[in-house]
Amino acid sequence: MLLYVNSVNASDPLANLDCREPGLVANGVFDQRSVDDLKSYRVLRFLDWSDANGNPASVTWAARSVPQRLVQDGTDGIALEHMVDLANAAGSDPWFTVPWNADEGYVRALGKLVHDRLAPGRKAYFELSNETWNYAFPIGNVVLNEGLARNLSPDRYSNNLLRYAEKSVWFHKLLTSAFEDNPARLVRVLNLQNGNGSGIDQMMNFRDTKQWVDAIATAPYFGHSLLRTVNVGVTDLPTLFASLETMRAQTIELAVSDKASATKWGKRYLSYEGGQHIVPPAASADVAMRMQRSPLMHDIYQRYLSDWKTKVGGTVTLYSATGAINQYGAWGIREYAGQPVSETPKRRAVLEAIAANQ
């Protein structure tokens, strides 16, 4: 909802406006229905709330978002206090994706805030930036150029991985200091492209990286080529889902390999994102939408999560909790808040998998 105010009476201005629905807690920050929707999830990754993909040029504690700010538009996205408080309210472990250019003061203060504010018994996951290996994001070339400037490797593109490892060690050392009284609450994450075991080895072999990392995370997505280079122009859903199933199975096998690489280094293996990755050309937008809403999508997510449990194990974080279907994909496991579970094939499969594991 947008409310435009064109003029006010200076002697009797607008005051105490409250746009929340009647019946909600007057001093509440979160809609309890949204909190309840998140309670099933053990880990909440605050990627989009952190603006890490926006790669702000400067991220300082002085310029950060604070809860009192009407518009949450600081260089670090939504206020960290809101992230911690939502995780506490949902009974989940928060996962913080911190912008690449966060300075030392910011990282130290972040660690202290999370350490002090997070509910007892909860773990905090931290990763520096998001998909620095992915040259589709501006951060990919930023990290590559920093690595090249430091001459970290004779191989051009290895400079990206090694610079990410180098700065992640700096980042995780600061956080380790903040949690030194209870290190078991801290999970220090490196993220990497799914199926890149050699990249894992490169980073773990680089200087003392392995001493400052607890977990390796990848994004086991499937279906990126569907309707673009595979089954172009096809509209028959069973045919499309047969191809998607092949891609799903291949992605799980890559995750199995990545877990083996992480285990070799004594590290946990996690999924930082995952699920279907169908981004159709405009001509196939309608059939892609039908796929997202099809019962066959529920079935493929069932198999995806079942295979993850039996072949991989550990934490799988899907992207994302809520998101509309548009030309950029269909990332949400539901399309809007409050959507009936019966209309959300992906979310229904997720909730069924969670219930089966309780």
What are these regions (language model features)?
Residues 29-93, 308-317:
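Catalytic domains of carbohydrate-active enzymes, especially glycoside hydrolases
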Residues 30, 124, 154-270:
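Noncatalytic carbohydrate-binding groove/subsite architecture in carbohydrate-active enzymes
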Residues 111-113, 190-217, 277-286, 325-335:
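Substrate-binding cleft/loops of secretory-pathway carbohydrate-active enzymes
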